[in-house]
A protein has these predicted regions:
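N-terminal low-complexity or simple alpha-helical regulatory segments
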Residues: 1-138
Length: 138
């Protein structure tokens, strides 16, 4: 199996900057909240997010607030699996180049390797690792 010739990105020291994620993760969130029976604006507001973040897909938003939006949406809709259902219907293309790299990779290994390599662009102050040993991926 071909190995990447690019140097492996080393984890950076933990900084005082809060973890963040690209606003593209909110593509379709408002509509999905409403399709599950809740009003999106109050849900996002309680989570510390503003409506329309999907219109600025390259802007970083607080990861904590994004995770809170999943909890608030689950509570507001009564669907304890809200986050899973949102993720299931989310199109990877919505993640921009990060998602496009994953879906156009020739193998799953290449997709995960590319995601690991470029994760720091998509999500800041977070870590994603992938390793395989004896045919088992971790």
């Amino acid at each position: 199996m071909p190995q990447s010739t690019l140097p492996k990105r080393q984890p950076q020291r933990r900084s005082q900057v809060p973890s963040s994620v690209l606003g593209s993760v909110t593509v379709g969130l408002e509509e999905f909240i409403q399709s599950q029976g809740a009003e999106s604006q109050p849900v996002l507001s309680r989570a510390g997010l503003k409506p329309g973040l999907y219109q600025q897909p390259n802007r970083h938003i607080s990861l904590k607030n994004y995770c809170n939006s999943m909890h608030e949406a689950a509570r507001a809709t009564g669907n304890e699996h809200f986050g899973l259902w949102f993720g299931e219907q989310f199109a990877p293309e919505g993640l921009g180049l990060f998602g496009y790299q994953a879906i156009t990779s020739p193998t799953l290994r290449d997709a995960i390797s590319g995601m690991e390599q470029w994760f720091h662009v998509f999500q800041r102050n977070s870590l994603l690792n992938f390793s395989s040993s004896g045919g088992i991926c971790q």
